[in-house]
C-alpha cells in the first residue's frame, strides 16, 4: 500500500513527459570491437621500458616508442598504478593512441583519487581522439584484457563527459552501461542530472530521472535536491514544495540546501511571503538557517524595496553568529543605492571594510552609479580611484556607468577618453557602452560620427539592439532626417531586431516636428499591427503634433482616446492642448483646461503660462482663478 501511495504522489511529476523510454537513444551503428595489439612481450624495447618505469629511470626510456609497445608495458604494469601514473605524466599525450589511453585509464582508476584517470579521459575528449561510443568500447576491452572487475571506470567516463560539458555523451554512456547489464553509481547519475540542469535542458533531466527510477537506482538527498531545483527553474514552485513531502515519504530528511533551493525560487519570483513560510517550516523541523538562507531573504526583500526588513534580517543574521559575506553586503548596498539612500549604502560599505571583508567591483558599481545620478561627479571619480587603490579593477559595468554619466553631462571628450581607457585595459565594450556614445554624438549633432560608431559595433562582433537603434533614430529625427530614420526601421526588420514603443514614439515625434501629423497617426496603427501597445507618450506626441498645426479636433480626439485607454493626461498633454487653443485664439477653452489641470493636481509650469500669455496677449487678458 505504501508503494501505491508513493507512486500516486509521483504521478504529478513529468516522469515520462514526451519520451518513449523504450526507444533507444543511440542508433545501433556497426562498430569494430576493440582489439589490443599483441606485440612480442619479449621485445627488448618493451623490457627496457618496463624496467625504466619500475626504477624511475626516465632518462632510459627510448624516444621512439610505438603505441603498441606502450600498451604492452602498461599491461605488464597493471598492478602498479603509481608507476603508470608517473610514466603517463612524463609522456607526451600525442604518443598515446586509444588502446593505450584506455589501458592507462583502467589502471589509474585503481588509485585512491579518480583525478588522474579523469584528467586522461578529459584530454582524450578534448583532443577528439574518438567518439564517446568508441571510448566506451575501448575501456570495456581494456577492462577485459586486464581482468578488471570494477565498473567505476565507466562512471569516470560519465563524469568526464559532464566536466567537458557534453552531458549527451554521459547519457549515452548511461544507456551503454544498461545494455551491458551494468548500472552507474548514483553519484554519476546526480552529476549527469546537474550537468543537464546547468545546460538549462530540464527535459533531459526529467528523462534521466525517469530512467533512474525505472532502473531502481536508489536516489539520495542530493538527487531530490537537484530535482527540486529543476522544478524551481521551470517556475513550478508549488510542485517543488510538494517534492519535499515526496522525498520525506521515501525516508529522506530535507536539508538546509533543500529549503534554500525553494526559498531561492520564491524570492526570484517576488513571492517573499511564501519564502517566509518556508523559513517557518525549517524552524519547525529543526533545520537551522545558514548564511545563504539569510542572504537569499535579504536579496528578495531588497528586490521588493523592503529595505528596512532586509536590514532587520541582516541584523538577525549577525546576532545569530552568522558571518555575512561580500555578496550580502553588496545586496544591501545596491538596494539602498536604488532608493537614493547613499548615506546608508556607504555605511554598509564602511562596515564591511571594518570587519575585514574586502569590497568587490559589485560593491563600488552601485555607489558610483548613485553618485552620478545625484550629480556628485567628483565624488564618483574619487570613488573609482579608491576602488583601483584597493586593487579592484573596474569592469565593463563600471565603465558603462562612467561613460553614460559623462554622456548625460554632455562631456563627450571625457566619455571617449574613458572608452579608450576601457579598451586599452582589455575591458571589452558592450552594447550599453556604444549606445551611450551614439546617444551623446546624436545629441551634439555629430551624426556622421554616430553612424560610424554604429557601424563599428558590427565589426566588434556585437549585435545592435533596440536601444542602440532607438538612439540613432532619435538623432536623425531630431535633425529632421526622417528618410534616414525610416531606413533604420527597415534595417531593424532585416536584422530581426523588434522595434518597441520608444522606436515608434520617436518616429511619430520626428514626423510631427516636420508637420506630418497625419503620417504619424498612421504609425499608431502600424505599431498596433505589430502587437506593440501605444503608451501615454504615443498619445501626447500626436496631441502635440495636431495642436502645433492648430488642428484641435484631432488633438482632442486623441485626448479622448487616451482617456478611454486608461491613460491620465499629463502636464505635457495640457500644455500641448493649451498651446494649440491659444494659437487658434480660443482663450476661453484654454482657461477651462487650465482650471481642469489644476483641479487634477497638475501644477502648470513656465511653458503653460508662456503659451497663455502669448496666445492671449492681444485678447481680453487672463482671468486668474482657482489659485492660478
Residues covered by each model-derived region:
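Inward-facing hydrophobic residues that define packing positions of alpha-helical scaffold repeats
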Residues: 88, 101, 108, 121, ...
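Pentatricopeptide repeat
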Residues: 66-70, 97, 101, 117, ...
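C-terminal interaction modules of eukaryotic adaptor/scaffold proteins
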Residues: 568, 573-576, 580-628
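N-terminal targeting peptides
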Residues: 1-222, 231-242, 246-249, 270-274, ...
Amino acid at each position: 500500500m505504501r508503494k501505491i501511495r508513493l507512486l500516486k504522489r509521483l504521478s504529478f511529476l513529468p516522469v515520462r513527459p514526451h519520451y518513449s523510454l523504450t526507444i533507444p537513444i543511440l542508433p545501433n551503428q556497426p562498430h569494430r570491437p576493440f582489439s589490443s595489439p599483441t606485440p612480442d612481450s619479449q621485445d627488448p624495447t618493451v623490457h627496457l621500458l618496463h624496467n625504466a618505469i619500475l626504477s624511475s629511470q626516465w632518462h632510459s626510456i627510448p624516444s621512439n616508442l610505438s603505441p603498441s609497445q606502450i600498451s604492452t608495458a602498461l599491461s605488464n604494469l597493471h598492478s602498479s598504478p603509481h608507476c603508470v601514473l608517473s610514466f603517463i605524466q612524463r609522456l607526451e599525450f600525442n604518443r598515446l593512441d586509444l588502446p593505450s589511453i584506455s589501458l592507462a585509464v583502467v589502471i589509474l582508476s585503481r588509485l585512491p583519487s579518480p583525478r588522474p584517470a579523469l584528467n586522461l579521459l578529459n584530454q582524450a575528449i578534448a583532443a577528439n581522439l574518438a567518439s564517446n561510443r568508441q571510448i566506451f568500447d575501448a575501456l570495456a576491452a581494456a577492462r577485459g584484457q586486464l581482468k578488471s572487475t570494477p565498473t567505476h571506470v565507466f562512471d569516470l567516463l560519465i563524469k568526464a563527459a559532464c566536466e567537458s560539458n557534453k552531458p549527451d555523451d554521459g547519457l549515452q554512456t548511461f544507456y551503454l552501461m544498461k545494455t551491458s547489464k551494468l548500472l552507474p553509481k548514483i553519484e554519476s547519475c546526480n552529476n549527469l542530472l546537474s550537468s543537464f540542469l546547468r545546460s538549462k535542458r530540464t527535459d533531459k533531466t526529467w528523462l534521466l530521472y525517469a530512467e533512474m527510477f525505472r532502473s531502481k537506482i536508489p536516489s539520495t538527498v542530493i538527487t531530490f535536491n537537484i530535482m527540486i531545483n529543476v522544478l524551481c527553474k521551470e517556475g513550478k514552485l508549488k510542485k517543488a514544495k510538494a517534492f519535499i513531502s515526496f522525498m520525506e515519504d521515501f525516508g529522506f530528511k530535507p536539508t538546509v540546501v533543500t529549503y534554500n533551493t525553494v526559498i531561492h525560487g520564491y524570492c526570484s519570483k517576488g513571492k517573499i511571503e511564501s519564502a517566509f513560510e518556508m523559513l517557518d517550516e525549517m524552524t519547525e523541523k529543526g533545520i537551522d538557517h545558514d548564511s545563504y538562507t539569510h542572504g537569499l531573504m535579504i536579496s528578495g526583500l531588497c528586490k521588493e524595496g523592503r529595505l528596512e526588513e532586509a536590514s532587520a534580517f541582516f541584523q538577525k543574521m549577525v546576532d545569530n553568529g552568522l558571518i555575512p559575506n561580500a555578496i550580502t553586503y553588496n545586496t544591501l548596498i545596491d538596494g539602498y543605492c536604488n532608493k537614493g539612500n547613499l548615506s546608508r549604502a556607504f555605511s554598509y560599505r564602511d562596515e564591511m571594510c571594518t570587519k575585514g571583508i574586502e569590497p568587490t567591483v559589485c560593491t563600488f558599481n552601485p555607489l558610483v552609479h548613485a553618485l552620478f545620478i545625484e550629480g556628485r561627479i567628483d565624488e564618483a571619480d574619487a570613488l573609482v580611484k579608491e576602488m583601483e587603490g584597493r586593487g579592484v579593477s573596474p569592469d565593463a559595468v563600471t565603465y558603462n556607468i562612467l561613460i553614460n554619466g559623462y554622456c548625460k553631462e554632455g562631456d563627450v571628450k571625457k566619455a571617449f577618453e574613458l572608452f579608450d581607457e576601457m579598451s586599452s585595459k582589455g575591458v571589452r565594450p558592450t552594447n550599453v557602452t556604444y549606445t551611450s556614445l551614439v546617444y551623446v554624438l546624436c545629441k551634439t549633432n555629430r551624426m556622421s560620427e554616430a553612424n560610424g560608431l554604429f557601424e563599428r559595433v558590427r565589426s566588434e562582433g556585437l549585435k545592435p539592439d533596440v536601444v542602440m537603434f532607438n538612439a540613432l533614430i532619435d538623432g536623425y529625427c531630431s535633425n529632421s532626417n526622417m528618410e534616414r530614420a525610416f531606413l533604420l526601421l527597415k534595417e531593424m526588420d532585416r536584422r530581426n531586431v523588434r522595434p518597441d514603443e520608444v522606436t515608434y514614439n520617436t518616429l511619430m515625434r520626428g514626423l510631427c516636428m516636420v508637420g506630418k501629423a497625419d503620417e504619424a497617426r498612421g504609425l499608431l496603427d502600424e505599431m498596433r499591427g505589430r502587437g506593440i501597445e501605444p503608451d501615454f507618450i504615443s498619445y501626447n506626441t500626436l496631441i502635440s503634433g495636431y495642436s502645433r498645426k492648430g488642428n484641435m479636433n484631432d488633438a482632442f480626439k486623441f485626448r479622448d482616446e487616451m482617456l478611454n485607454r486608461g491613460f491620465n493626461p499629463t502636464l505635457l498633454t495640457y500644455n500641448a492642448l493649451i498651446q494649440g487653443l491659444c494659437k487658434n485664439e480660443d482663450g476661453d477653452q484654454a482657461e477651462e483646461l487650465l482650471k481642469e489641470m489644476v483641479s487634477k493636481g497638475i501644477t502648470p509650469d513656465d511653458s503653460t503660462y508662456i503659451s497663455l500669455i502669448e496666445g492671449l496677449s492681444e485678447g481680453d487678458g487672463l482671468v486668474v482663478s482657482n489659485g492660478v
